[in-house]
């Protein structure tokens, strides 16, 4: 399980923690290297893992400018009880539409892509 947690003064979008279990019902055990990542640009989970170009990928929120500013797509290089490594392979920035202020969530499954965005909208429309 991937999780973001506020531990030891960190914000809940600064660090990535992993947990593993033999059953979905637990007991859940923390990864021995938690937090496995400390980077406000790519730690907070932003959707489910997905396969892309033959690799397992993890979407993450880039909260460097504000909460849910952009999406970092990270290819998982290694994941086991001893180690976790990933590398950024793509980014989705909010600039593709003038009204979009942030890109919060990315999910891809069975050829369908879903994104959750923050948009500027007039209250008086």
Where are the regions that the model predicts?
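Carbohydrate-active catalytic/glycan-binding domains of CAZyme proteins
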Residues: 1-125
């Amino acid at each position: 399980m991937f999780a973001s947690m506020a531990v030891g003064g960190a914000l809940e979008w600064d660090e990535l923690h992993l947990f593993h279990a033999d059953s979905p019902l637990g007991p859940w055990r923390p990864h021995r290297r938690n937090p496995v990542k400390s980077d406000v640009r790519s730690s907070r989970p932003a959707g489910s893992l997905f396969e892309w170009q033959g690799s397992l990928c993890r979407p993450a929120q880039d909260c460097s400018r504000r909460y849910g500013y952009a999406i970092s797509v990270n290819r998982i290089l290694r994941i086991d009880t001893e180690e976790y490594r990933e590398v950024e392979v793509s980014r989705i920035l909010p600039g593709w539409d003038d009204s979009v202020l942030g890109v919060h969530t990315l999910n891809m499954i069975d050829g369908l892509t879903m994104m959750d965005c923050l948009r500027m909208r007039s209250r008086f429309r």
